[in-house]
Amino acid sequence: MNREITFFGRFEADILADRKTITIRDSSESDFRSGEVLRVCRNEDGVFFCHIKVKSVTPVTLDGLSERHAEQENMSLDELKKVIKAIYPGLDRFYVIEFTRC
């Protein structure tokens, strides 16, 4: 049985179109392994919409986020930092989970 990861519904279309290829999470959601296949569901209602395969899990700080991270999230760097600050207020250490849709 595959473990599950959730995304806000606003990211579903980008994931399904392969425009979003990373997710940035805090330490409570950093225990995924390279090669692991995850069920992907919407955070708001738990509806399943695809599977992803984890490519890597890499630590990063808020200041360490780059234009490349923003590109992989399909947004600008300023937008990315605002989203991360809104989801994880007061935190500075995160994990970049790179994935491919399967």
UniProtKB/Swiss-Prot annotation:
SUPFAM superfamilies: PUA domain-like (SSF88697)
Catalytic site: 20 (proton acceptor), 23 (nucleophile), 73 (proton donor)
CDD domains for the chain: ASCH_yqfb_like (cd06552)
Summary of the function given for this chain in its UniProt record: Catalyzes the hydrolysis of N(4)-acetylcytidine (ac4C).
Record has Hydrolase as a keyword: yes
Statement: the UniProt record of this protein carries the keyword Hydrolase: yes
Originating species: Yersinia pestis
GO cellular component: cytosol
Identification of the protein by name: N(4)-acetylcytidine amidohydrolase
